[in-house]
Each structure stands twice: as structure tokens, then as C-alpha cells.
């Protein structure tokens, strides 16, 4: 099996980007160890604080955020850092080439029940037309990402990443401490009958979205064998879709704060959209390509539909009267 470093060099990835990726992944190994220790390491439970999203922070959320932030701020190639757990961007080296955004632990509600959780990250080239430490550094289209990936912590720790080419999967070799290539090209099947959606939110959705799920569950013969899988961790649901197909949906709803969806564009929707597209799937928001959405703020939320092409287009045609071709 090939080591990550070898694969990246064969893909023609520049040395400075390879080194930055390795920096991020060094921290992922520490997070993986702490996750595996659980209560033995005293990392379970919540703090008394809330993040900017209004969510109570888990202890492991805070630890993972601090580990990633500290190592990135100490990296001379990094100009600015953004995190789900930070109100604003944090400046690093004013001359740094890259900016990095991350969700330190996606699915943090699963921490205390030993469920699926993961770290999502994305890397862009820094902008020279705005202050180095400003939120505006991240006002870039998702299509501009030079690297996107996640580490899924579970029975084995998996890295799924793309540097613009294929979406590949690596497994952490805990014996030697390196990530080894275990799937050279993840490919999302065009058709699938599996769906990742929180059906408890049905009563909050608008009528077109409800109609879609009514058709899906009761009248559409194309999906008469459909089944729902829901991990309460986007990173876990998307990983399953990358491996065997399906559709992840988190529509907007009529609850206060969810009018524009719940998934954060910068460090959740964009990196996962890039991974899904580069695996042959589709990723849209209100019928438009996610990677073409112009961001307006650091923690902007968007409704998300991503995964297998056929059910994604069926959703868009039903709800938005659009095939969202691209």
C-alpha cells in the first residue's frame, strides 16, 4: 500500500501544500487517540460554554479545536485560520500562502455515546486584496479549494481527501502512524435507494419538500425499496454515500435560525461537496451547485442535497423545478 506522501507527490501536489496537509493530519492522529480513550482520558461531557452557533461545546470539541488551531497558527505557510468554534478568523503569518478552515469535530452530539464523529478541513490560497486576518479571506467560492478532506474516527480512522483530482481514501496505520492508500478512487453510484435525512423535521419543511418525501415514500416506484440511514453526523453519512451511494439531505425549514438550512457552507458543505463531485456525485443547494455559491459570512448556513446524481436531480426537479445541470 502506498503512503499518503507518495500519492500526493505522484499527483503533482506542491511541496508546501503537502507539508500543510501533513501538519493537519498530525493533529488528526492525536484527536484519534483521544477519541479512542474516551472517558479514560476525561474528554467526554460538555463544557459550560456555547460557540457562535449557539451550541453547547463538548469537551472534546474544545480540545480538538485548540489542537488544530495551535498547530496551524504555528505553521508559516498559513495566513489565516477559521473554525466552527471561533467567532471570527484568526490571523497567523501575514505572508502565509494558504488559509485553512475546519470543523474540529463534526457530529459532536455522538461523542458521549461512542458514535461516529470526524474532522472536516478545507484549504484555499490566501487573498492579497483583503487584510490577512479578516473574515473576508474566506469569501471565496468552494470551487477555489485546493484541498478538502475529512478524518472519520471509528473502528479504524479513515482519511478521505481530494487535492483537485480523484477522491481517495486512506486508513491510519496505528502501528506506524501513517495514512496508507486503501481506495484509489471513490465512486458514487448514479442511482441509489438510501437516504440520509432527519425525518423528524418533516413537519417543519415547506410543502414542496414534504411532497418530495411523500412521493419518495409512497408513490415513486423508482424508489420503492428506499431506506433511511441517519447518523446525526454529516461526515459519517457522507462517507457511507461515497462508499456505496445514496443521498444526504438537510433542507431549510421554518424554525427560527433554520430558514437558510443548518449546514455551514465554508467548513462543512464546501469540502464535502468537492469530495462528492470528484467522486462522480452531485452537490446542490436550492437547485444550485454548492461550489458556485458566493459566501457572505464566515458561518453562513445553506440547505444541502448531495450524493447520487439521480435522486439529487429528482429532488431538485420536484422542489425547485430545476435539474441543476452543470
Curated annotation (Swiss-Prot):
Mg(2+) 2 binds at residues 103, 106, 268. Its EC number is 3.1.3.11. It catalyses: beta-D-fructose 1,6-bisphosphate + H2O = beta-D-fructose 6-phosphate + phosphate. One of its GO terms (molecular function) is magnesium ion binding. SUPFAM superfamilies: Carbohydrate phosphatase (SSF56655). InterPro entries: FBPase_C_dom, FBPase_class-1, FBPase_N, FBPtase, Fructose_bisphosphatase_AS. Mg(2+) 1 binds at residues 84, 103, 105. It is an enzyme of class 3 (hydrolase). This is Fructose-1,6-bisphosphatase class 1 2. It comes from Pseudoalteromonas translucida (strain TAC 125).
